[in-house]
Amino acid sequence: MNNKNHLKIATRQSPLALWQANYVKDRLTALYPDLQVELVTMVTKGDVILDTPLAKIGGKGLFVKELEHALLNHEADIAVHSMKDVPMEFPQGLGLSVICKREDPRDAFVSNKYRSLAELPQGAIVGTSSLRRQCQLKSLRPDLDIRSLRGNVGTRLSKLDNGDYDAIILASAGLIRLGMAERIASFIETDISLPAAGQGAVGIECRVDDELVQSLLAPLAHQETTICVLAERAMNNRLQGGCQVPIGGFAQVKNGEVFLRALVGATDGSQIIRAEGKSAVENAEVLGVQIAEDLLQQGADKILKSVYQD
């Protein structure tokens, strides 16, 4: 940072990524009126390869690596991410500074013809880029024709509007943030479609030795969201899952305890393994590991191994 009054935010160029970066910018400038905040936009591997399902591209950090290079090269001071895209392991010298307050974590059912999953006719075509959503949909409705759907939110909605799909499944948070909540035909409750770890939360990454930036970011942290996302990510990490695997994890804080539900599913929906538990909030990450161990004891590793081999 130059003279402690200029901060650069690395961000992807999609409308949702820019919304998230501007959200952080607005929070910071409200706190520090003399701070100049600049967005540095860039394209990631996940943005470029749009003709291949995410799970087939391979690797972790498809939407963050280029942003991390900018941090390491001092071309930016912070990077703003959707938490569900952030790998557990960070490059040396970088780390997660804060997790902001979570938006609605549920999946959204979006259709121009039908109001809910239950209304979909036999063999309806449903678009999703997520193996997690696919396995839960297939378990609930084996008759559905699940097809890959890539691109930013606007692109996906256009494909629906063009008649390529009867319905598509998106994260509610993205639609709400982009002012498109009216496109949500219905919210899919978490007992029907368990969200991805970190879904709906925004995280900020920075250089670990940049104490000034860390102190500037500290007021943006949301304690309850942080507890929940840390539990979810600890579970995901123990399962060695990235963001392109059929793993769901969702935590909630109630009465001073954190409750975590998680699942691992075969992509065809033929098998879904579930686990849940609770602990004191200070043990959120320990709980995440325990829930993952429960899933592994039930055979989650065999399911995940078959997914990686596909």
UniProtKB/Swiss-Prot annotation:
What cofactors are annotated for this protein? Answer: dipyrromethane
Q: Where is it found, in Gene Ontology cellular component terms?
A: cytoplasm
- The enzyme's E.C. designation: 2.5.1.61
The processes (GO biological process) annotated in the record are: protoporphyrinogen IX biosynthetic process
The answer to keyword Protease applying to this record is no
* Pathway where this protein functions: Porphyrin-containing compound metabolism; protoporphyrin-IX biosynthesis; coproporphyrinogen-III from 5-aminolevulinate: step 2/4
**What does the record give under GO molecular function?**
hydroxymethylbilane synthase activity
Main EC class the enzyme belongs to: transferase
* Binding note for cofactor: Binds 1 dipyrromethane group covalently.
Q: What is an example of a Pfam family matching this protein?
A: Porphobil_deamC
Q: Which UniProt keywords apply?
A: Porphyrin biosynthesis, Transferase
Write down the InterPro entries for this protein, in alphabetical order.
Answer: HemC (IPR000860), Porphobilin_deaminase_cofac_BS (IPR022419), Porphobilin_deaminase_N (IPR022417), Porphobilinogen_deaminase_C (IPR022418), Porphobilinogen_deaminase_C_sf (IPR036803)
Which reaction is catalysed here?
4 porphobilinogen + H2O = hydroxymethylbilane + 4 NH4(+)
S-(dipyrrolylmethanemethyl)cysteine carried by residues: 243
Q: Any idea what job this protein has?
A: Tetrapolymerization of the monopyrrole PBG into the hydroxymethylbilane pre-uroporphyrinogen in several discrete steps.
Q: What family does this chain come from, according to its entry? A: Belongs to the HMBS family.
Assembly and partners are described as: Monomer.
Q: What else is known?
A: The porphobilinogen subunits are added to the dipyrromethane group.
Name this polypeptide is given: Porphobilinogen deaminase
In its UniProt entry, the species of origin is given as Mannheimia succiniciproducens (strain KCTC 0769BP / MBEL55E)
